[in-house]
Amino acid sequence: MGRRLGELTKNNTKCMVEVNGIPLIDRLLSQLSALDLSRVVIVVGYEGEKLKRHIGDRYDSGLKIEYIDNPIYDKTNNIYSLALAKDKMLEQDTLLIESDLIFEDNMFRLILDNPYPNLALVAKYEPWMDGTMVRIDENCNILDFVPKHLFNYNETDSYYKTVNIYKFSKDFSANVYIPFMEAYTRALGNNEYYEQVLRVITFLDKLELKALPIGDERWYEIDDVQDLDIAETIFAEGKEQLGKYMKRFGGYWRFPKVLDFCYLVNPYFPPQKMRCELRANFDKLLTEYPSGMAVNSLLAGKYFGINRAHVCVGNGAAELIKAYIEKYAQGKTGVVYPTFEEYPNRAVADNLVKFIPGNKDFSYTARDIIEFFTDKGLSTLLFINPDNPSGNYIPKCDLLELIAWTKAQCITLLVDESFVDFTTGGAENTLLRDEVLAANTHLVVVKSISKSYGVPGLRLGVIASGNKDLISSLKKEVAIWNINSFAEYYMQIFGKYESEYHVACKKFVEERTRFYKELCSVPYLRVIPSQANYFLCEITDKYTSSELAETLLSRYNILIKDCGSKSAFAGSNYIRIAVRDQADNDMLLAALKTL
């Protein structure tokens, strides 16, 4: 019945749910039409007549469709529905398919072309999977079925999920499965699952059912609206698929096969011991409230070695950007483009004064900024250093010149240094120093703790200034519990791992240097040097930026940032590629060099 799909199955059976505009049943019957089948038997229950009318005679040229009605569908489970079709199973070999699946066409060829007569398609366990699991040996013999109530998260490495597509021979159905199913239902009733019969059969000395792993074939089981949303992303095509991924703004753990070169995270931190410490305290942190702003300001001050009165902690830098710009960035606001769009998006559009460097690398110096904005009457100037997405970097000595100029001009200067620890000089280039902040109360520094510290899921960021009244006011703007206990505890223990953090940043710089040289060998890319954890690349041949992004995603499950649609690029073909660890970077390089 699909109750968890809510309104989508209020007046429709589950297989009528549409994925990207196509009902599941239509997709399935079209796939079956391409096979050499004697008939298709559909067991119907809830809204069965509506389903029959929907199917009509549209598939008569390729399929012989028969229906079996389950009049007590609301009191039974799938074991009863299958039992209603047992006579059909006794007549011929059977493909058994559940109606809430979406999968690639090749799945049927995979199971039909395999000579073994009795097979269950299985997929290596991934975190999204729910329901019956199996364990198999090196010969794909099924050792046991693991029902949902016996699932053990400590044993997931040994689990395979049943895809719920089976091939049963006529003999297996007649001599093994159906006799056991009949005995099972007599003993336990009809409100059970047919997989439980297979679990019982595994206790036989000789099990005639083998598993067939599907490898990287795409599939999804749709039980609720979240499943539907994910399935529509996985099974979208081309530009539509890329757009669906981009609109998620993260959460890519739901897509374990996707390699994310879009979002920007240090691959070498935090270290394993720190992760273990966080895990060891998980239960306590999960069940207790975090501290308020006073304690977290103290922790942030300790984290960066600055006065707690100079810093405000946020639920990611994005929260602080919003709070600051919407309230304090009044008057004309200078922005260096291209940039992280959250900054200009939060400002009043009519107040924006845009500086777009006049070169193909989008590079600029402190002197370029001063010369452009000198006569613009700014109240606020903001930019990112190193910049996003260009990777352009203004050295600290030149940045101090810009700080002095804005001070003399009574301009508030906001510098986002979220990527500064990736620079060759590392943390030595930071502006988060009490002496710098205290001497320049017009200076505001934003720093994300997601990027170089490798913990974007914790949603941590800080805003700092020598203007204590400003910081005090910002602390009142955000909620009293604006970060969670896990983020707070991370800040609490960071000091124990700080030396490892600096080692990780140096290791990152080494990999960035290697990766840059390799990227430069891709003939259709012009790679712009970067001091951040990404490269802005111009595509000079073969593809547009959107075509390359779509191709990498559809063929290789690799996600990159298409910058071509951003206004500052004026339709030019630029992409941004994150720097990950060597293994991941080499996978991207192999894909780029194959295209």
Regions found by a protein language model. Name each.
Residues 22-92:
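Conserved N-terminal catalytic core of the sugar/cofactor nucleotidyltransferase
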Residues 1-10:
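N-terminal nucleotide-binding beta1-loop-alpha1 segment
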Residues 509, 522-556:
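Conserved PLP-binding catalytic core of the aspartate aminotransferase-like
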Residues 158-162, 269-273, 292, 442-528:
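PLP-dependent aminotransferase class I/II
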Residues 104-188:
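Conserved core of the sugar-phosphate nucleotidyltransferase
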Residues 230-288, 376-377:
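N-terminal "arm"/small-domain region of PLP-dependent enzymes with the aminotransferase-like
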Residues 60-132:
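Conserved beta-loop-beta/alpha segment of the NTase-like Rossmann-fold superfamily
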Residues 110-114, 363-377, 389-452:
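Active-site pre-lysine segment of PLP-dependent enzymes
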